[in-house]
Amino acid sequence: LYIDNSPLKSSMLSTVLQKGAIYALLVVSMNLLNGFTGLFSLGQAGFMLLGAYTYAILTIPVDQRINVYQYFDGGIVQFQMPQIPALILAGAVAALFAALIGAPVLRLKSDYLAIATLGFAEILRAVIQWEKLGPLTNASNILRKFTGYDSILFPFIVSGVCIAIIVLLINSTYGRAFKAIREDEIAAEAMGINLMKHKMLSFCTSSFFAGIGGALLAMFQFNAHAKN
């Protein structure tokens, strides 16, 4: 049996595995909402975008900001956060936006919910590239030079921890409530389950991990851009 151990082959395998770990987290986060709670949302890309931009904005070194924000005098953010706090904050910002739009959109059903969340993602993509927000988001220009990861194990560890947390949530009393809502909302409400509370929890949790996944993808790609 001949195995090609060339640097190119190992590099390609590493790339595929890293991207696979990141997308595994994104798929599991989406499955929490679509599969276990029965909410057909297509807004995951928007929350990934929020996570990627939040992480990138917060971790660009101060001395590099003038090069990244060359059209906006170095931007308005003039500090650099450590990697892990910035990663958590990336998820938190995505969850915050999910909470803001959750109250109106989670009252919609089926295709209407899908259209509303997809519309949110597209509007967000356009807003981030708005010239007026350039000092923060760099408008339509690429965000780069932010903190990446040194070890290829990093995305596997982060994704593994996040997926484990999601699995624990699914197997908890909250997870059983999510499944009850998916099967029959009327019966779930008759059993004393607060529909809006649990829908919002599922929506925000899914968005939180989508934001972390978006930040990991930005690190993997070495840049963040609304078109990616």
In which residue ranges do the predicted regions lie?
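Transmembrane alpha-helices and adjacent helix-loop boundaries
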Residues: L1-N228
